[in-house]
Amino acid sequence: MKKQTGFTLIELMISLALGLAISWVMLDVSLNAVRNGQDITSNGDVIEKGRFMGDLLKREIKHAGFFGRIVSANVQSNSPQTNWCTNAPAVKQLTTPVFGLDNQSSLCSSINLLAGSDVLMIRRASTLTTAPGSLVASQDYIQSNFEDIILAKGVAANFTLKEIDGVTLAPIREYHQDLYYVDNNNNFKRRRLINGSNIIEPLIEGVDDFQLQYGIDTNDDNIPDTFNTTPISNDYSSWQNVKTVTVFLLISSEYSSLPDDKTYNYAGQTKGPLNDSKKRRLFSFSVSVGNQY
């Protein structure tokens, strides 16, 4: 009868060691794949949020000061900036279609801002016209021709301006008055004047900073001569001469990623290293303000 044999103790220990080594390699490969997947997801999340906010703010800043037709100097006002938290806009506010606050902690008594961040207000008319029969009584609208402008509630009798032929009613457009800011939970939000009420809309999460830099024309050639992060608040001439707005957005991912050991320098600010497990990216872009009167 053939004698049965088995593994020796040494052979068993070697096989166990090889098995552990192979298992460790497979685990390491799996963990690296998971980490790489999370990193790709986090990077895509940040890029998508930056792209969305970039497209939105570029469009809004570009349209700032668009009120339909070009109007004459009788719209001009040297009055200081009025309370921009109000839900009762006035024609004299239209002379500052771009207005901002620097390094704020609160806004409109009830909004807590991300400490040190900026606030941007955009005033403009819709690019679409509204028929007199479709006006909403509580909504603010603008009507303008080449000589005058009306800002009033949506009652057809309020809008009497005519085209150059003296017969055709001048176009009526919905009035937009929007505040852009980051709250103390790192959420980028927009406060919109809709139907006579200020409505807050969440836009994106994970904004670690929002800074603005303004290109100001000092010699009336419509070209920025100085770049300032803090134009004089309530000073009409400073804001009337803003020709460009540069936006800086520091955006972080929702998902965990590799530790962030970078330092970010922008608009006179320095942030980092933050040393947390978030993917971050600094987005910046400049937009011309082409509709100042």
Each language-model region and where it sits:
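N-terminal pilin/flagellin-like segments and related low-complexity appendage regions
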Residues: 53-240, 248, 256-279
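Alpha-helical hydrophobic packing sites
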Residues: 17, 223, 290-293
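Short, loop-centered acidic/histidine patches that primarily coordinate divalent metals
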Residues: 248-254, 290-292
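Aliphatic-rich helix starts adjacent to a transmembrane/signal segment
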Residues: 2-64
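C-terminal helical cap and adjacent loop that interface with cofactors, partners, or active-site loops
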Residues: 245
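Low-complexity, S/T/G/P-rich flexible repeat/linker segments used as non-globular hinges
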Residues: 274-293
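Short capping/connector residues at structural and topological boundaries
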Residues: 39, 51, 72-74, 288, ...
